[in-house]
């Protein structure tokens, strides 16, 4: 991934605005430390801060079409780029080996709707010189971050950037650009291009679970995400989701390393034929112990890192600066991920696989055990998936990209979502003694199939859900709460700020994070934040920690 900035129809002289644009783009350089680029056409400027993963030597951006009339700045990876190149009708002269260059010619042949043809994670802005317009698009789920800004001083100017910090100095209104949409400045319309069969949360599927299909679709998703020309690894917490991704990745890495094929998959081999795994936690935390066991089982080159509570607290302001949120759940989980990402990047790794999305797809958060019906269970799953760009995707993207590390999330593959969200929700529910994410566990349980090698140790495969902020060590959350008590007095807590409106923090911890956020960001940035809380209507505690949910408490008795 990278950092992008685009400003269309600049109100002032473009050359006079250029230094300001470059300064704004510089705020994103942590996302792309490898190179900086810009392109100016008429009154439009596109900037790019590059993290080179594919097309390392030739893929500098912005990308320009063979006739010079289309200019593109992209943050993301297009996994089907080779097939898309082959299917182009025209005979185009590609200038790079970048996976993103194909977007230029897809747009030429199909217009803005070409976004629906892309299999990957992406945010991009394209300038069409003939029509003097821009088109912006974001991937279906919002794995990559993208914001759109507006200025009352120049209402005809369109602003786009990967992060808020590149927009708030010049925009007085900012929105999170909706996933699965494209924007066309010619019509000034934002159009939803992503229309999967599962989108209507009131349409309840009735398909029985096909365990083989579920397993093979996830394996295919991991395989395509190994596309890289740089060393990669996996984030391994020792929980079900990250452990499954690590297991599949280890198999695929070994398979590719031993292959003599020149297929698309074979070209993803890096300098490391053995998979590297990375874990973090407080000393002695549940995640570290479980991750170590998984790494031993998979024979990965395992890197275990610890942090102290003081180190986590010291990083908190930086975490809020990079995450651009005050949501309690996101900040709790992002802090160890942020610290781990720094360690990983220092070890020469640029890309990791991560396990985000599984809990939303399969109802893995323990509060789902309170779902009153299959209909309610499914609707909540779909709602959570639709809002991932405001929570876990935001965390996975910004925690890692703070250090120029790219995170890829196989569970959010379009094909996998199509399979998993069309399963009868009753198959996912916590009934008849079933654990959370039962069908996912069952799909990778080889106990009764001697033709398959085990994916994971049984006690890991059937380990109860621990949210990342819990698994790194329960004392981490306790320390955050205790520190908030010291930082926020009872008198201050009783007088929330008027500008917060109805978004009033209900705990001192939430109040503290909002206060820190306001010290860093101007008021308009708060409109992009959504707080993650369990389903109150289901009788769930408001604290998002999994250990406060009934299922976790019952399991400990």
From Swiss-Prot:
Keyword Nuclease applies: no
First and last residue of the signal peptide: none
UniProt keyword terms in alphabetical order: Amino-acid biosynthesis, Asparagine biosynthesis, ATP-binding, Cytoplasm, Glutamine amidotransferase, Ligase, Nucleotide-binding, Nucleus, Phosphoprotein
Domain called Glutamine amidotransferase type-2: residue spans: 2-188
Domain of life: Eukaryota
Knockout-associated phenotype: Causes asparagine auxotrophy.
Biological processes, Gene Ontology terms: asparagine biosynthetic process; L-asparagine biosynthetic process
Organism of provenance: Schizosaccharomyces pombe (strain 972 / ATCC 24843)
Pathway(s) of this molecule: Amino-acid biosynthesis; L-asparagine biosynthesis; L-asparagine from L-aspartate (L-Gln route): step 1/1
Residue sites binding L-glutamine per the record: 50-54, 75-77, 99
Catalytic activity: L-aspartate + L-glutamine + ATP + H2O = L-asparagine + L-glutamate + AMP + diphosphate + H(+)
Annotated site residues (Important for beta-aspartyl-AMP intermediate formation) in this chain: 356
Record Pfam families: Asn_synthase, GATase_7
Name the UniProt record assigns to this protein: Probable asparagine synthetase [glutamine-hydrolyzing]
PANTHER family per the UniProt record, alphabetical: ASPARAGINE SYNTHETASE, ASPARAGINE SYNTHETASE [GLUTAMINE-HYDROLYZING]
Any one GO molecular-function label of the UniProt entry: ATP binding
Subcellular location: Cytoplasm; Nucleus
Lineage: Eukaryota, Fungi, Dikarya, Ascomycota, Taphrinomycotina
């Amino acid at each position: 991934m990278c950092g992008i900035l685009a400003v269309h129809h600049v109100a002032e002289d473009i050359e006079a605005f250029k230094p300001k644009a470059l300064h704004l783009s510089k705020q994103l350089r942590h996302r792309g430390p490898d190179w900086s680029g810009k392109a100016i056409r008429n009154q439009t400027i596109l900037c790019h801060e590059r993290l080179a993963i594919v097309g390392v030597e030739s893929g500098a951006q912005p990308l320009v079409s063979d006739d010079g009339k289309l200019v593109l700045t992209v943050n993301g990876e297009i996994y089907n780029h080779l097939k898309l190149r082959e299917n182009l009708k025209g005979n185009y002269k590609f200038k790079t080996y970048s996976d993103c260059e194909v977007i230029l010619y897809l747009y030429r042949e199909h217009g803005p709707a070409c976004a629906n043809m892309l299999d990957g994670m992406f945010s991009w802005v394209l300038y069409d010189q003939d029509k003097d317009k821009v088109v912006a698009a974001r991937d279906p789920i919002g794995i990559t971050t993208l914001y759109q800004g507006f200025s009352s001083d120049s209402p005809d100017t369109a602003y786009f950037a990967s992060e808020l910090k590149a927009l708030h100095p010049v925009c007085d209104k900012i929105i999170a650009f909706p996933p699965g949409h494209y924007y066309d400045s010619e019509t000034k319309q934002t159009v939803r291009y992503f229309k999967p069969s599962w989108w209507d949360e009131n349409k309840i599927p009735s398909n029985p679970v096909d365990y083989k299909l579920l397993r093979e679709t996830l394996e295919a998703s991991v395989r395509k995400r190994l596309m890289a020309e740089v060393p990669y690894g996996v984030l391994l917490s020792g929980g079900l989701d990250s452990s499954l991704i690590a297991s599949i990745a280890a198999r695929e890495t070994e398979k590719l390393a031993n292959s003599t094929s020149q297929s698309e998959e074979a070209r993803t081999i890096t300098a490391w034929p053995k998979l590297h795994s990375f874990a973090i936690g407080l000393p002695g935390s549940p995640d570290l112990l479980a991750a170590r066991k998984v790494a031993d089982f998979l024979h990965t080159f395992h890197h275990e890192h610890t942090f102290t509570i003081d180190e986590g607290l010291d990083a908190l302001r930086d975490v809020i600066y990079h995450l651009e949120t005050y949501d309690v759940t996101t900040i709790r989980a992002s802090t160890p991920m942020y610290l781990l990402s720094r360690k990983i990047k220092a070890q020469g790794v640029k890309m990791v696989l991560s396990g985000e999305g599984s809990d939303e797809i399969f109802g893995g958060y323990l509060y789902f055990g309170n779902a009153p019906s299959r209909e309610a269970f499914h609707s909540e799953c779909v709602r959570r998936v639709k809002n991932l760009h405001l929570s876990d995707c935001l965390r996975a993207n910004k925690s890692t990209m703070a250090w120029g590390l790219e995170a890829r999330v196989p569970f959010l593959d379009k094909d996998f979502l199509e399979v998993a969200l069309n399963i009868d929700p009753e198959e996912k529910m916590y009934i008849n003694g079933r654990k959370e994410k039962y069908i996912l566990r069952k799909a990778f349980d080889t106990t009764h199939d001697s033709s398959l090698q085990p994916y994971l140790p049984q006690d890991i495969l059937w380990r109860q859900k621990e949210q990342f902020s819990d698994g790194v060590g329960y004392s981490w959350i306790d320390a955050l709460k205790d520190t908030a008590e010291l930082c926020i007095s009872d008198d201050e807590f009783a007088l929330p700020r008027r500008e917060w409106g109805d978004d009033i923090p209900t705990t001192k911890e939430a109040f503290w994070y909002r206060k820190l956020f306001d010290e860093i960001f101007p008021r308009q940035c708060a409109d992009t934040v959504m707080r993650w809380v369990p389903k109150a209507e289901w009788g769930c505690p408001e604290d998002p920690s999994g250990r406060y949910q009934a299922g976790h408490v019952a399991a400990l008795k």
